[in-house]
A protein has these predicted regions:
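Acidic catalytic/metal-coordinating carboxylates
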Residues: 35-38, 61-67
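Short hydrophobic/Thr-rich beta-strand motif most characteristic of the beta2 strand and flanking loop
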Residues: 27-34, 42
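Active-site residues of response regulator receiver
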Residues: 54, 86
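Short amphipathic alpha-helix used as the core "switch/output" element in two-component signaling
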Residues: 63-77
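Charged docking surfaces used in two-component/phosphorelay signaling
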Residues: 17-25
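The feature encodes the CheY-like receiver
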Residues: 58, 90
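Conserved acidic carboxylate
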Residues: 10
Length: 131
């Protein structure tokens, strides 16, 4: 799966700017929103190849967004991959996110621009999931 369009849902301005700058420099088309509600609206209104989803967000938690998009009978974003972004302290949240059909998760404290691009490349190379 070729990834071209990315939605970044991240409320930390410094981190969000780093992701967006790195992704733009790598040739991706990136939209960035800073709260959960706007993230959910954006994910529903545009067909993104990848969503970078922070767990701790204002307005709506990342796990709620994931549950809304993929937790029901229908996958509302069947053509999108999701990488959950989490902190060390949120191990249970990471597990919960993966149970709700996230495609991968990254520990925010360990993410560098290079590691982010490597994680995206791994998703691009992965075989399609059978649903």
């Amino acid at each position: 799966m070729a990834i071209k369009s990315i939605l970044c849902i991240e409320d930390d301005r410094f981190i969000g700017e780093m992701y967006v700058r790195s992704l733009h420099n790598a040739g991706y088309d990136v939209d960035w929103v800073v709260d959960g509600h706007d993230g959910l609206v954006a994910a529903r209104n545009k067909d993104y190849d990848l969503i970078l989803l922070d767990i701790m967000l204002p307005e709506m938690r990342g796990t709620e967004i994931l549950e809304t998009l993929r937790g029901g009978e229908d996958d509302l974003i069947p053509n999108s991959k999701i990488i959950v972004l989490t902190n060390f302290e949120q191990d249970d949240e990471s597990r919960l996110a993966m149970e709700h059909n996230a495609d991968a998760y990254l520990i925010k404290a360990e993410i560098t621009p290079r590691k982010l691009l490597e994680a995206i490349a791994e998703l691009e190379a992965a075989p399609p999931q059978q649903g």
